[in-house]
């Protein structure tokens, strides 16, 4: 609890030596004037503050400064052409995979066809075909 009291005392002592307002020349914004209250968010505060702080040279109104985060800076972003080969390689891999699957399926179908042709025939087709044995 003692540290809290020491901290409060340090804050009070430090606030005595701080400046009450920034110097007039350090901020280059428009001074507060009742005729400039165009911002809807500051309109309710202007009437009560204008008579009280109008003579204070350090109080400024930020109504003319844009509050829109979409506005951004005036810097134009250069759009460089994208030279990524990720998507074309992905497409080629997919097509290669489909082609390999198609070939494998046709070879399996041919092996099945040869196997079914060899069933029940005891003549010169007695040995299973070489192609069918290769793919199982």
Swiss-Prot record:
It is found in: Secreted. Residues 27-76, 123-136 form a propeptide. GO terms for molecular function: diuretic hormone activity. The keyword Ion transport does not apply. Residues 1-26 form the signal peptide. The modification Isoleucine amide is found at residue 119. The keyword Signal applies. PROSITE patterns: CRF (PS00511). GO terms for biological process: body fluid secretion. Its main location: secreted. Keywords: Amidation, Cleavage on pair of basic residues, Hormone, Secreted, Signal. GO terms for cellular component: extracellular region. InterPro entries: Corticotropin-releasing_fac_CS, CRF. Regulation of fluid secretion. Belongs to the sauvagine/corticotropin-releasing factor/urotensin I family. This is Diuretic hormone 41.
């Amino acid at each position: 609890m003692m540290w809290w009291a020491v901290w409060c005392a340090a804050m009070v002592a430090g606030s005595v030596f701080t400046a009450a307002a920034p110097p007039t020349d350090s901020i280059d914004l428009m001074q507060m004037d009742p005729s400039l209250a165009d911002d809807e968010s500051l309109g309710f505060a202007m009437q009560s503050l204008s008579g009280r702080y109008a003579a204070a040279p350090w109080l400024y109104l930020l109504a003319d400064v844009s509050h829109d985060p979409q506005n951004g800076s005036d810097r134009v972003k250069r759009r460089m052409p994208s030279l990524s080969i990720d998507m074309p390689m992905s497409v080629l891999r997919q097509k290669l995979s489909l082609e390999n699957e198609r070939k494998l399926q046709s070879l399996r179908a041919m092996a099945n066809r040869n196997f079914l042709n060899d069933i029940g025939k005891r003549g010169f087709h007695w040995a299973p075909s070489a192609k069918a044995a290769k793919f199982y």
